[in-house]
Amino acid sequence: MTTEEESLSPGEEGYSVQRDFWRQAAKSDGFDLENVKRPPGMNGVVIGLIPYYCQLYNRYPYRILVDLFAKVGLHRYNLFKGTSFEVAALIKFNMLQNYMSSFYMTLLAHDPDPAASSLEKTFQVRVDEQDYGTLHITCSIARIKAEGNLLVVHYFPYIFFNKISLSLLINNECCIVSTETPFIPHFQGGARAYGIFKGELPDWPSDDAFNDGKRFYLVKESEWQSTDWISMYLELVITTTDRSITETRQKTEVLSQLEIVKVAIETANEDVEPPNERLKAKSAHVYITFKGLAEPRAPRRVFENGEHVERQAIVRRVMDHTGYLTLKGKLCGGEYIKKRSLALKSGEESQDCKKQARVG
C-alpha cells in the first residue's frame, strides 16, 4: 500500500474502491466481472453489480423475468437486423442492487432460419427497468459478443448511490466509457418517441374502433402463433405487474395457462402493403385480448377472478434510429382501491383502460 493510500480516510477509501470497481466493470460495458478485483474485506463496501452464473446454479433470482429480458434483447436485434435469433441458453447475468434494476446478460442464441448459420452465437443484452410494478423497460444493448467495439475508458472519480435508483454525481472529472455513449450503470433514458407514441399509453379502443382497417391491423391467429414476441409482450406485462410470479415461487404455471384471443396492431403509417408488414414496425401499439389468468394482481387494483374472464393488455413498442428499444405496457381493467382490504364492487369498472373513441 502506498503512502497516499495509507493516508485515506475510511470514506475516501470507499470512494476510491467504488471508483476502481466501475472503472474495471466499464471495460466490458458491465458484462464481464470475472477479472474485476476488489481489495480484501471490501466486498460489502462496494455497491456494484451482483454476478449470477446460470449454468453453474439452477436457482437464480427473478428467473422468469430475466429469461424474458434476454428474449427482449434478441427481439431488438431481430427487428434491427431482420434475423430470427432465439434464446438457446442463458450463461450469466449481472444486476444492480437497486429497487429498479439493470440487467447485463450473456446468452447463447441460434437462428432457426435454414439460410442462416447453424452455429450458436454468444450475445450480450442490457435491459434497464424504468419503473416498478408495471412494464417499462429499455434495451440499449443487444449484440453478438464478437461484434462489440473497443471502448475508450475514462472513469468517474466519485460515485454516490441512493436507495431507489443509482445516481451518479461527478466531481472534478468527466467520464466517457463506451463505443458511442457514456457508460452509466443504470440508464434512465429510452427510445425517442413521436406522435401517438409519446406520453401516456392509450385507452382501450371501442369495439367499433377496431373495425377501422386503416387504424388497426387485426393479426391473424396463425400470425400470432408463429410470432413469439406477441406472447412475450403479454408475459412481460403480467410478470412486471405482479412481481410475486417471478420473485419468490417462480410461478411458471401462471404463464403456461395464458391463451391469446385477439391481437390488434396500431402503427403511425396506416397505408402499409401488405398490411401484415405492420407487425415489423419500429413503433407500434399492440392490443392483446386474452384469458387464462385466474387471479390478476396489480398495485392498488382488484380484479374479477377466473380463468374464463377475457382481459386486455396494451404494449407500446418504440425503437429509434439509435437502436434503443423501449417497451411500455399495462394490464387493463380492475378497480382502483385506497386500501388493499377494499373489494371490487359489482358493476364498477377501472378507468385505467376505459373504452373511448380516438381523438384527432
Question: What function would you assign to each model-found segment?
Answer:
Residues 1-360:
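N- and C-terminal low-complexity/disordered segments
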